[in-house]
């Protein structure tokens, strides 16, 4: 408990003597309600306005009262102000001491602490502090109300004194009481909040009871499949008497040994053309196209028109329509090298028509010939006042039957399809209830918790990276 004294005029003795009113508090008091606070504030402003009009006769009357043995009210209130300041400091100290932090119990590192017991102790401490605060609140409210009534009655007993000066003093007294009660309300709010429970701490485990992890042998890095890129060239002959089988045999025996490239396949086409599939790099295809041996044997070689290279232009604004895109592509990138008619034969739009309602941007795919490909190989195209990133689209074969690489479904040796989600046979990914498991990574001893043929697959990602590096 904290005791404090407020110096005030005792109305029961005519205001001639000064008494003391003890004030006890266990913790703090709460603030006035909103309506009471507003009322006191309005009263204080009105009294301050009246006090500003204090006149000299009022001061003379106060001096006369003091000479007759009546103490000056303002001086008495000044002492009351000082006492109230002491009371506010004492209340603050009481609030700080009302809920001392609980001493931390000794922690046994071999046994996990009981979190529920610690929480109960903290809750009990907070409840006791709140009850003490509310008990002190009632006592303080009663004391402050009685103090205000006694001061006002003392002022009324002073006859012949101008009330303006007394109103100013009462206003100052009310403001100080209001500040004290607001401060006590803040302290009570802080006391009413329960302390946070202690954080749970894990028990230290000894080496004896620590779980033993199984020893796993290190997995060697798996061998990744070598990337195979397939390009095709078509050979035609002007001699109608020469069959497709004869053309293929002539190329196999008379042309292929002098090409200096690895020929993957030589087969006959229905139109009596011959198709040469080479692989490993674009440079090998260029060697086949530049060979003069074909002309010496009366053969014409050209790249397969069905496999024109493709270029992707990224993040094109959908506000630019397809026709406007192609027109700007020619004017800003190909105008100095080919006419509009030549451009339309060399560059074809593969992406279906888009509009502004399809989103903010769209990736545009173009099918180009070798001449246009050399121009777009710089990596940037200019449309209107924008510059867009572009890159050649590299084709990598992936089998959707066995989910392997380097061959198509028509070339797959496996007869039954596997699920793309778990890599097992007998069902499809749409009806699969098994967890995600990459068949390719599992066979190579790598983490397999991802989809096959996805960006999360390290094997498929390495394949794409190597293919892109060759271009």
Curated annotation (Swiss-Prot):
Biased composition (Basic residues): 40-50
Gene Ontology molecular function, alphabetical: nucleic acid binding; zinc ion binding
Residue ranges of the region described as Gag-like cysteine motif: 438-457
Chain residue ranges for the region called Disordered: 13-57
Family matches, as SMART domains: ZnF_C2HC
Superkingdom classification of source: Eukaryota
Regions of compositional bias (Low complexity) in chain numbering: 27-39
Keyword terms of this UniProt record: Metal-binding, Repeat, Transposable element, Zinc, Zinc-finger
Zinc finger (CCHC-type): 397-414, 417-434
Signal peptide: none
Record family assignment: To corresponding ORF of B.mori (R1BM).
Name of protein: Uncharacterized 50 kDa protein in type I retrotransposable element R1DM
Species in which this protein is naturally found: Drosophila melanogaster
């Amino acid at each position: 408990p904290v005791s404090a004294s407020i110096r005030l005029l005792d109305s029961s003795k005519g205001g001639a003597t000064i008494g003391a009113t003890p004030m006890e508090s266990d913790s703090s008091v709460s603030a006035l309600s909103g309506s009471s606070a507003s009322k006191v504030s309005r009263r204080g402003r009105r009294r301050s306005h009246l006090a500003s009009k204090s006149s000299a006769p009022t001061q003379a009357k106060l001096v006369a009262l003091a000479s007759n043995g009546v103490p000056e009210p303002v001086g008495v209130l000044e002492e009351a102000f000082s006492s109230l300041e002491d009371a506010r400091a004492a209340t603050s100290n009481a609030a700080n001491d009302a809920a001392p932090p609980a001493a931390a119990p000794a922690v046994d590192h071999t046994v996990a602490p009981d979190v529920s017991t610690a929480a109960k102790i903290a809750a009990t401490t907070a409840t006791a502090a709140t009850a003490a605060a509310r008990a002190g609140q009632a006592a303080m409210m009663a004391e402050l109300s009685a103090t205000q009534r006694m001061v006002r009655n003392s002022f009324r007993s002073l006859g012949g004194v101008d009330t303006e000066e007394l109103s100013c003093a009462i206003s100052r007294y009310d403001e100080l009481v209001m500040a004290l009660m607001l401060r006590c309300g803040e302290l009570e709010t802080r006391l009413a909040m329960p302390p946070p429970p202690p954080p749970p701490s894990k028990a230290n485990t000894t080496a004896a009871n620590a779980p033993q992890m199984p020893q796993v042998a290190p997995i060697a890095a798996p061998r990744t499949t070598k990337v195979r890129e397939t390009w095709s060239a078509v050979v035609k002959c002007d001699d109608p008497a020469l069959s497709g089988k004869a053309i293929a045999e002539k190329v196999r025996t008379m042309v292929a040994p002098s090409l200096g490239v690895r020929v993957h396949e030589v087969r006959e086409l229905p139109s009596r053309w011959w198709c040469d599939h080479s692989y490993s790099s674009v440079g090998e295809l260029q060697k086949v196209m530049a060979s003069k041996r074909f002309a010496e044997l009366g053969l014409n070689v050209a790249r397969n028109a069905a496999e024109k290279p493709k270029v992707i232009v990224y993040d094109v604004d959908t506000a630019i329509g397809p026709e406007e895109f192609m027109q700007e592509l020619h004017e800003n990138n190909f105008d100095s090298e080919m006419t509009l008619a030549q451009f339309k034969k060399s560059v074809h739009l593969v992406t279906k028509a888009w509009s502004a309602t399809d989103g903010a941007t769209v990736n545009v795919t173009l099918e180009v010939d070798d001449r246009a490909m050399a121009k777009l190989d710089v990596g940037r195209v200019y449309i209107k006042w924008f510059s867009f990133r572009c890159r050649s689209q590299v084709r990598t074969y992936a089998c959707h039957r066995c989910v392997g690489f380097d061959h198509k479904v028509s070339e797959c040796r496996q007869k039954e399809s596997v699920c793309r989600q778990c890599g097992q046979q007998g069902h499809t990914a749409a009806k699969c209830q098994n967890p995600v498991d990459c068949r390719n990574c599992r066979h190579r001893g790598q983490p397999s918790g991802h989809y096959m043929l996805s960006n999360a697959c390290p094997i498929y990602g390495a394949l794409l990276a190597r293919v892109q590096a060759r271009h």
